Curated annotation (Swiss-Prot):
Protein name: 7-methyl-GTP pyrophosphatase
Site for Important for substrate specificity, residues: Y12, Q70, E155
Highest taxon in the source lineage: Bacteria
Pfam families (alphabetical): Maf
Cofactor: a divalent metal cation
Source species: Syntrophotalea carbinolica (strain DSM 2380 / NBRC 103641 / GraBd1) (Pelobacter carbinolicus)
Record-level Gene Ontology MF annotations: nucleoside triphosphate diphosphatase activity
Amino acid sequence: MKIIVLASTSPYRMQLMRQLGLPFHVAAPQYQEQIDQEIAPELLVKHQAAGKAKSLAQKYPDALIIGSDQVFVDASGRVLGKPDSLEGAVRQLRGMAGKSHTFYTGLSVYDSNRDETLTGFATYRVTLRALTEQEIRCYLQRENPLDCAGSFKVEGLGIALMQRLEGDDYTTLIGLPLIKLVDFLGHFGVRVLGDQA
């Protein structure tokens, strides 16, 4: 089986990859992320996921390299990244409370030997409860989600902020859409269940 490389240092993505039971390497992508409000979010995350995967091609010339990127689009259509500070996180959550928002997660699997790429994206919609200032600050103090787009971790205490979650694959929300990844790996001959090609 070809070497599989996860182009990410995210502990959340690594944990999701472990669910598949496949051996894999982890490497930090050599790619500079940029949020551009003028680019449609689905195009942005696909472009950045592919950029992350391809950035490791020289280091791994015969591998399947997985890149993923996520942005959070608030109810007004504005793309939000990770908060810049605790106060930035307070502002994000204050503005999002009581509204529905969408996560866009891009996925790319790059076969560095064949120079072949599969790229796609998945979405997940979240509706936050109405939140008081005290609830927002209590949450941020207890979880400190400054490394997460949207300022919350739904896989942790952030679930208490939610009123509703909607989507086909909850792992999209965490940053690596596993249903789509299993399909992409299958295209390259990697069977999560069964014989490996």
